Amino acid sequence: MTVEEVKKIIDEESLKGGNLFEKRKNKENEMVIMNVAEQWFVYATDERASKITGSEKKFKTEEEALDNFITRLRALNVLKN
């Protein structure tokens, strides 16, 4: 999966609560994907916008991280609705 494909899925499915490589502070109850030194991380935040302990997963490839991000973002949206 590519960033463009993820953006298309987010738009088509009207998914909310995702931080797709944005350089900003975390928001409450969102799924975050970030790249640090060619390693990709996906994690969830809580109601105080803090990283949820145990939620962070590290990936060696962007594709794996994006797959995980979109799966978890879909789940987050099911829980919110």
Which residues does each PLM region occupy?
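Residues in flexible loops and secondary-structure boundaries
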Residues: 18, 23, 39-41, 50, ...
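A structural signal for short, well-ordered beta-strand elements
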Residues: 55-59
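Intrinsically disordered, low-complexity charged/polar segments
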Residues: 75-81
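Negatively charged, low-complexity tracts enriched in Asp/Glu with abundant Ser/Thr
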Residues: 1-26
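Phox homology (PX) phosphoinositide-binding domain
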Residues: 32-36, 63, 81
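Short aromatic-glycine-(Arg/Gly/Cys) micro-motifs in beta-strand/loop hairpins
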Residues: 27-54, 72
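A short, charged, amphipathic alpha-helix used as a generic interaction element across diverse proteins
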Residues: 4, 60-73
